[in-house]
Amino acid sequence: YNTYYYDRFYLPGQELKKHCDRAACEISISIHVSSNIEEHWPIYIKTPDVYTVNSKSSKQKTFSGIEKKGDVVGVMLNPGDGVLYKGCERPHWRERMPGTFEMMKEGAEQLYYHQIFFHYVLQDGIRAHHAWDECN
């Protein structure tokens, strides 16, 4: 079931602190809508699940846009891309957004990163009573 969605604009220097989501966010999808920053700004997910593809050699390659460091996966999203994850189980975060905050100087373009989060619970799961959540 769907629970709620959240629309957010990040500005330079803002971050998403490391956390696990509340019960209404059993399954989460984070979608990068648009941005005007020049570098990738990954969302990090701590997870033992490593999504890889086998190459012809004995090495494994990670999918494009995914960076793995130990048990942390950094996912770089282009506008229109999304990532699906278990929000209640997997700690996730973003480091400080790059860039400097322009104090609305005339003619200055404000850097931003626009993201929408969609949250769900399993229909027959232990969190199903959070369907159509009204807390947000």
Task: Give the predicted meaning of each segment.
Residues 119:
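An acidic, glycine-/histidine-flanked metal-binding catalytic module
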Residues 1-6:
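A short coil-to-beta-strand element that immediately follows conserved catalytic motifs
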Residues 16-19, 91-107:
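Short beta-strand His + acidic residue motifs that chelate non-heme Fe in jelly-roll/DSBH
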Residues 12-89, 112-116, 125-135:
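Catalytic core of non-heme Fe(II) oxygenases with the double-stranded beta-helix
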